[in-house]
């Protein structure tokens, strides 16, 4: 699964537990890649 800065296609891509798929500001299209980033809180 993806940890910090692992690429993810969208929110459905599998980021590790405790991580979420975040898109940069310039990634406006749905097909644009985002990256997994650690969320606050436990898992």
Swiss-Prot record:
GO terms for molecular function: toxin activity. Keywords: Disulfide bond, Knottin, Neurotoxin, Secreted, Toxin. GO terms for cellular component: extracellular region. Expressed by the venom gland. It is found in: Secreted. Disulfide bonds join 1-16, 8-21, 15-36, 17-43. Contains 4 disulfide bonds. This toxin blocks the neuromuscular transmission, and also acts on muscle. It exerts an effect of first exciting and then inhibiting the contraction of muscle. This toxin is active only against mammals. The presence of a 'disulfide through disulfide knot' structurally defines this protein as a knottin. Belongs to the neurotoxin 35 family. This is U5-hexatoxin-Mr1a. It comes from Macrothele raveni (Funnel-web spider).
């Amino acid at each position: 699964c993806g940890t910090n800065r692992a690429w993810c296609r969208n929110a459905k891509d599998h980021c590790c537990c405790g991580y979420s798929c975040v898109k940069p500001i310039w990634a406006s299209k749905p097909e644009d890649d985002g990256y997994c980033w650690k969320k606050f809180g436990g898992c």
